[in-house]
Every structure is written in structure tokens, then in C-alpha cells.
Design a protein with these regions (language model features):
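Interaction-mediating elements
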Residues: 1-110
Length: 110
């Protein structure tokens, strides 16, 4: 953990690079080892957000370490700079998951 789920209507050319870069960013923002960051990207989706211009929805889950008010701007800027999606067309959901509800390596964290 953390887990980053990126859904966008934009077509992303270098998916592996984008996943690597957003993993690095979220690792830095949460002070969690990049080794434990998992990221998923679904691009070129049919999405609607007031109209059909490109948009993006990010879901970020973690056991603690989330500071939505501090993380929203750098993540939005990343999406704008790397994906070309304006900040006003981005939603981000931050979800703090209890340790007892998150499992890795056959065991929960709490």
C-alpha cells in the first residue's frame, strides 16, 4: 500500500512510464516505500464530465499517511503536466483504509 487507481478518457502513449512516475510521486507524498506502492491505469475510457473533453478520476487508498489537502495539488499538477488534462477536469478520492482491512503476503496489517 498505497494503491493508486487512475481512470481517464485520455489515450496514454507510455503507460509504464506514467505508472512509474505516479508511483514515485505518491510514495514521496505518503512517505511510504515505493516498493509497496501499487498503481493501475485504465486509459481511453468512455467518460463524461459535463462534456466529452478528456477527464481523469484517481482513487488513492492507503493505511494512514494520507493528507488530502496537501496531496491534491501536486497530484493534480502531475495529471495536467503528464496527461494534459486540466485541473478542473480531475477528481481525486482519498481513502484511508483500516489496517485490519488491508492484506499483503497472506496477512492483514492490523
Amino acid at each position: 500500500m498505497p494503491y493508486i487507481n487512475v481512470s481517464t478518457s485520455a489515450k496514454i502513449e507510455d503507460k509504464k512510464k506514467l505508472l512509474e512516475e505516479i508511483s514515485t510521486l505518491v510514495s514521496s507524498l505518503t512517505n511510504k516505500s515505493k516498493r509497496f506502492v501499487m498503481a493501475k491505469l485504465d486509459d481511453n475510457l468512455e467518460m463524461y464530465f459535463d462534456d466529452e473533453r478528456p477527464c481523469c478520476f484517481l482513487e488513492i487508498k492507503s493505511i494512514g499517511s494520507l493528507s488530502p489537502s496537501e496531496m491534491a495539488k501536486p497530484i493534480s499538477n502531475f495529471v495536467w503536466e503528464k496527461m494534459g488534462i486540466p485541473i478542473d477536469r480531475i477528481y481525486i478520492s482519498f481513502i484511508d483504509v483500516p489496517a485490519s482491512f488491508w492484506s499483503w503476503n497472506g496477512r492483514t496489517f492490523g
